[in-house]
From Swiss-Prot:
Homooligomer. Seems to be able to homodimerize and homotrimerize. GO terms for cellular component: extracellular space. Residues 153-169, 193-202, 236-259, 268-298, 316-326 have a biased composition (Gly residues). This is Dermokine. The keyword Secreted applies. The gene is DMKN. O-glycosylated. Residues 299-315 have a biased composition (Low complexity). It comes from Homo sapiens.
Length: 476
């Protein structure tokens, strides 16, 4: 190694110096200490220079300082012990042997330390390189300068070279120039935590590609900006006319670099959060599915996934066959079955009209089947039997007794008068129930007219009530 030359020079100087100062036993301890310090400083400087060239100036200085400290302490102890154990004549020879053994041991130790330092440096370089490549398993502080993952824990959500291309900050930034996502190194199609590129506001509305409106769409737009109620064609094979997939080949997630955990961002291979890959998927996973549609607020057919792919069933109310869903507020009758290739016939019911009495009367008669409706319609109702008349007459009397607050006398007399007039069939006949005399046109005499045949006598209220009551109360 590079410190072998300075080490040999130091050993030679020590051996020569030790021979001259050998007989002085009183300086044994100080001599050992001085020799140890010299050896320690020399080895430390050599190691500092070698390690500094290997791993850089700052790291080399730190490592060299530690190694110098350790070697200085060990060398002082070893040389001091050897000097104290061999006093008197021949100190130079013994000291030379001891120093030689110590130097050999230190050489082996330095070689081992160098090998371990080289391994550490190599592992550190690999870790640094892996952090910029989105290695899934790395943790630690090697990725704090704008890597592609949350310190490497999720494997680089945006893949190599797509996230934070111009920044050095932490993954929680609000968007660097040139990156509209702003966080996690996502693709320029936007990410859930981004705030829009170049300071743009979050776009929570419909993006220009017909996919889920996510924060981060402030700066990236597609080529076909059709956001109106355009009713795109049913088939999604080949793009379509509106919101049918955006430009092919746009940056829509890394290829094979891991995903966001729940495919909520379209970061796996082949998919996108906005359906921008040609023939891509509707919800982030490769191959196309009707899942979460790139982080939408609902499943397939939700209000926010509006035609997010060019060949899948995301956001299609009518089933598979095209990713052109319907924008809320723009749906028209007949659009429900367009995606599945059907004719789109409106399947709505007729609005109910006015009240139909004929239908109601038919339903009512059907529920009362025990009544002979034909006889009633033909006015062929048989007269009630005597037993029925007596039964209902008794009920009527009980009802009148239970309702004394009604003037039944006036009610019954008025009913009798009307019923008697109908039965007599004479409009010119005058009934006098109060027994008053009316003047006639002949000579001014007063006459009392009697009721016609079938009438009731005004003197008997009981005989007057029953026939009129039964005639007034009808049971059909």
């Amino acid at each position: 190694m590079k410190f072998q030359g300075p080490l040999a020079c130091l050993l030679l100087a020590l051996c020569l110096g030790s021979g001259e100062a050998g007989p002085l036993q009183s300086g044994e301890e100080s001599t050992g200490t001085n020799i140890g310090e010299a050896l320690g400083h020399g080895l430390g400087d050599a190691l500092s220079e070698g390690v500094g060239k290997a791993i850089g100036k700052e790291a080399g200085g730190a490592a060299g300082s530690k190694v110098s400290e350790a070697l200085g302490q060990g060398t002082r102890e070893a040389v001091g012990t050897g000097v104290r154990q061999v006093p008197g004549f021949g100190v130079a020879d013994a000291l030379g042997n001891r120093v030689g053994e110590a130097a050999h041991a230190l050489g082996n130790t330095g070689h081992e330390i160098g090998r371990q330092a080289e391994d550490v440096i190599r592992h550190g370089a690999d870790a640094v390189r892996g952090s910029w490549q989105g290695v899934p398993g790395h943790n630690g502080a090697w990725e704090t300068s704008g890597g592609h993952g949350i310190f490497g824990s999720q494997g680089g959500l945006g893949g190599q070279g797509q996230g934070n291309p111009g920044g050095l900050g932490t993954p929680w930034v609000h968007g660097y120039p040139g990156n509209s996502a702003g966080s996690f190194g996502m693709n320029p199609q936007g990410a859930p935590w981004g705030q829009g590129g170049n300071g743009g506001p979050p776009n929570f509305g419909t993006n220009t590609q017909g996919a889920v409106a996510q924060p981060g769409y402030g700066s990236v737009r597609a080529s076909n900006q059709n956001e109106g109620c355009t009713n795109p064609p049913p088939s999604g094979s080949g793009g379509g006319s509106s919101n049918s997939g955006g430009g092919s080949g746009s940056q829509s997630g890394s290829s094979g670099s891991g995903s966001n955990g729940d495919n909520n961002n379209g970061s796996s291979s082949g998919g996108s959060s906005s359906g921008s890959s040609s023939g891509g998927s509707s919800g982030g996973s490769s191959g196309g599915s009707s899942g979460n549609s790139g982080g939408s607020r609902g499943d397939s057919g939700s209000e926010s996934s509006w035609g997010s792919s060019t060949g899948s069933s995301s956001g299609n109310h009518g089933g598979s066959g095209g990713g052109n869903g319907h924008k809320p507020g723009c749906e028209k009758p007949g659009n429900e079955a367009r995606g599945s290739g059907e004719s789109g016939i409106q399947n709505s019911e007729t609005s109910p009209g006015m009240f139909n009495f004929d239908t109601f009367w038919k339903n009512f008669k059907s529920k009362l089947g025990f009544i002979n409706w034909d006889a009633i319609n033909k006015n062929q109702v048989p007269p009630p039997s005597t037993r029925a008349l007596l039964y209902f007459s008794r009920l009527w009397e009980d009802f009148k007794q239970n309702t004394p607050f009604l003037n039944w006398k006036a009610i019954i007399e008025g009913a009798d008068a009307s019923s008697l007039q109908k039965r007599a069939g004479r409009d010119d006949q005058n009934y006098n129930y109060n027994q008053h005399a009316y003047p006639t046109a002949y000579g001014g005499k007063y006459s009392v007219k009697t009721p016609a045949k079938g009438g009731v006598s005004p003197s008997s209220s009981a005989s007057r009530v029953q026939p009129g009551l039964l005639q007034w109360v009808k049971f059909w």
